[in-house]
């Protein structure tokens, strides 16, 4: 039994996903449109992902001191994935989406992940943009999330630090107000971050024009010290390239790549320090 057949059984016979079409958000869909999406991703997985899974594992990302270099196959797979519109598949039409049920979007991404986890790591961008839709300001959503859903920009989550690992309460990255007018920026209060992040998947590459890092950091108290534990932690939007209020790139930000980590598995995924 193929993975495609297994997904069909799970979606149709067990979950009865076509019943979701009775909801207003998914009213334009049917079992046929669900199958069409799965067929597209199945073909993409077989043609652009699976044949190059071993290649990207052998030709690991490398840093030449200025940029991260990836195999051409990774670039082509990413471009093909963006062309399907799957980055915004579950979003409303307002965000360029298909208004697919999340269940169908997830099933389609399973096909790609099984073909090559390394190449399909760009799905992290969707999670980044979804967080901005849930917690970002309207301007932040328009400037950052929209570009991520279109595939022009990518996204990451930056939690781990060299001295803390993934122990959230032990992070020490600081975020200090940037000038007297730091609250006047139309994209939100502006801070300068000082610290180191480690093991960041897709932390740097040339697949997209920009990378939107969501960085966990602490704002110092009045005495300049950091609050122990998880209290005082905030989340900051830190783009690789600075942008203006209209989303135009204005120059390089102070995000510095120190190097790449060697991975035991999924070696085709960029993992940064």
Regions found by a protein language model. Give the residues of each.
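C-terminal structured domain segments across diverse proteins
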Residues: 133, 158-159, 169, 187-188, ...
